């Protein structure tokens, strides 16, 4: 956990590492964390919005609409078939008391806090030897953004425009900085210098 008023920057996971982690967590019967990481990586939702999801919102559906906690804006999301299947599998193993229950409930019966999720993610990072420096809830949203950008590398400006809208950023420059692209571009400048 970071100190209050200190700045830490979450890093993204390489997509293949994120997908492997989702599978490993499910194999190890850690279905709640597998589902959390899958939802974060496939939807790009903020952790506050993931924690507010109920089973009835995401189970047996292709699309669902939320009101974002941070912005108050309504947002419709689509779940691809693989994610839908993973949700159903996790639901079957977790066996919530009712489908109106929140999806990420602790053993005490309360919704996980963001702080607790971050502690768990740090434990997961260590246990599964993830190659990421700062791994937190926000890493999932950044992983989503990086994958969307990487999949559209031949038309990166269009990808950035889409991500800017999805993330509700006010400019492409903010989205680039958010994804760490601006820093990479700056550092690449040094590579072009020759002696």
Where are these regions (language model features)?
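DNA breakage-rejoining catalytic core of tyrosine-based enzymes
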Residues: 1-19, 73-81
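Basic, Lys/Arg- and aromatic-enriched nucleic-acid-binding interface segment
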Residues: 2, 13-43, 154-155
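Active-site/catalytic core of tyrosine-dependent DNA strand-transfer enzymes
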Residues: 19, 82-132
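Alpha-helix N-cap/helix-start motif at helix boundaries, enriched for small hydrophobics
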Residues: 36, 44, 48-53, 163
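Active-site-proximal segment of tyrosine recombinases
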Residues: 49-50, 145, 153-169
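Conserved tyrosine-mediated DNA breakage-rejoining catalytic core shared by Y-recombinases
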Residues: 52-83
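Catalytic-site neighborhood detector that most strongly recognizes the C-terminal catalytic loop/helix
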Residues: 68-72, 167-192
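Short basic/aromatic active-site micro-motif
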Residues: 131-151
């Amino acid at each position: 956990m970071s100190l209050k008023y200190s700045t830490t920057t979450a890093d993204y996971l390489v997509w293949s590492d994120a997908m492997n982690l989702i599978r490993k967590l499910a194999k190890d019967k850690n279905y709640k964390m597998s589902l959390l990481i899958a939802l974060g990586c496939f939807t790009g939702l903020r952790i506050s919005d993931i924690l507010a999801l109920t089973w009835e919102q995401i189970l047996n559906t292709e699309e669902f609409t939320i009101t974002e906690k941070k912005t108050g804006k309504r947002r419709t999301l689509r779940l691809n078939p693989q994610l839908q299947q993973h949700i159903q599998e996790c639901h079957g193993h977790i066996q919530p008391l009712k489908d109106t229950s929140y999806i990420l409930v602790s053993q005490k019966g309360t919704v996980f806090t963001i702080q607790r999720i971050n502690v768990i993610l740090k434990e997961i990072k260590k246990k599964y030897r993830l190659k990421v420096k700062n791994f937190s809830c926000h890493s999932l949203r950044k992983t989503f953004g990086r994958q969307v950008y990487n999949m559209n590398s031949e038309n990166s400006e269009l990808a950035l425009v889409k991500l800017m809208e999805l993330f509700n950023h006010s400019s492409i420059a903010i989205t680039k900085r958010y994804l760490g692209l601006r820093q990479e571009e700056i550092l690449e400048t040094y590579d072009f210098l020759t002696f």
